[in-house]
Amino acid sequence: MYPARLRTTWSHSVSEDLVHWEELPTALYPGEGDEPDASGVWTGSVIYGEGRYHAFYTGYCLTAEYQQTICHATSEDGITWVKDAANPVITPMIELYEKLDWRDPYVFYNEEDKCYWILISARRLDMPITRRGCIVLYRSKDLVNWEYYGPIYSPGHTNCPECPEMYKMGDNWYLSYSRFSEYVNTIYRVAKSPFGPWRKPKKDGIGGRRFYAAKSMQDDDGRRFYFGWAHDRADRSDRGEWYWGGTFCVPHEVVATEDGGLDVKLPKEYEHVFEKHVDWDYIPVLGNAELHGDRLVEMDSVSTCTYGFLGHSEESYMLKCKIMSREVYDHFGILLKSDKEASGCLLLEFDVAMQRVSLVNLPMGVDPFWVQSCQAVPPATEPGPDGVRVCEKTFDITEGSEIDVCLLYTSPSPRDTERSR
């Protein structure tokens, strides 16, 4: 699965509303023989400048001296692309950086520096081996001749900062990238200058742990959206082996806050899709629960655990609710894709003691003795929710306060299932 997925193309899709997408002809295919992109056309970026479109991408070639290099293609209409005969246009500086990781170029015009910038993911030779990941800067006046500047960010916490990009919102500059480490995530840093220094905000994640390799764009109204990928799993099972690559996620919108942070929220376009009210029933399973009218469920879990299910017939829906907790010192949450025993499911968990919101895959690993002693629980086999959003801002889980929850669930189409194979 892994080697086959490396020989990627650049697919091209467009949308007017972030929900409905039209596929256009494939923009770039891998090369042949010993060409620098013969083993795959990896990620990069596109800019319109100097009278035409320019794509800078990672050329991958297993048989080349430098397996990962920066390649270039141009287009007059953004649809049909011609590769640069001079490819690769930027190769690793092996006296300073490793050969292996030299990729993920991000190009933009820096108004403050009055030239084009290109950011490259790399690994410094003068750093500890698992902490060498850095972002290297080149500059150009014409998108053809590039001058080396040096590492613009070396966090010392990652093997490689994948898919970096930089942009300005308000008075702040933002540098985002996907952290390839044991703490995998798409994260961001903030600075007053594009040259740094880059500071870590209190909450630096864009999306959850599996919202990865995310790249953003800004529309004509100044709204910025991140487009990322959720790793898929073998057999489309929540218990399957994690694969490299994955499924296109619901876009995430980011909004700058007064303190320089980024709030992440669901684009309003998705809420407009689910405008029809869905009738539902509460089906109690365990504990003490009472339905008030047709909109309020009250649960009393003193000395017990209380849960039940919402009965309805929809395959794709949006669940919006308010949760108010009282005298809760453990956790509460929402079960997703659960069996009746709530033993094989996903749990959107609000942990009061830890002040943490998590999407937990149950059952979790336990001591081997208990695994052998307990009844076997079949794993969930259906794909998980497309996206989960918990409020739009950082919040405290406190007694008597309301928590707004918005959750999307869409069943995969047969075409999506076929694509995953």
Language-model segments: which ranges?
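Beta-propeller blade signature
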Residues: 11-15, 70-77, 134-141, 188-193, ...
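Beta-propeller fold recognition
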Residues: 234-287
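Entry beta-strands of beta-propeller and related beta-repeat scaffolds
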Residues: 52-55, 114-118, 172-174, 223-225
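Short, solvent-exposed loop/turn segments at conserved positions within beta-propeller repeat blades
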Residues: 3-8, 64-68, 128-133, 181-184, ...
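Conserved small/polar residues in nucleotide/adenosyl-binding loops
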Residues: 409-416
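Short, aromatic/His-centered strand-loop micro-motif at the edge of beta-sheets
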Residues: 368-404
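Surface loop/turn signatures of beta-propeller and other carbohydrate-active proteins
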Residues: 2-3, 19-48, 79-109, 126-129, ...
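Secretory/extracellular carbohydrate-interaction modules
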Residues: 300-369
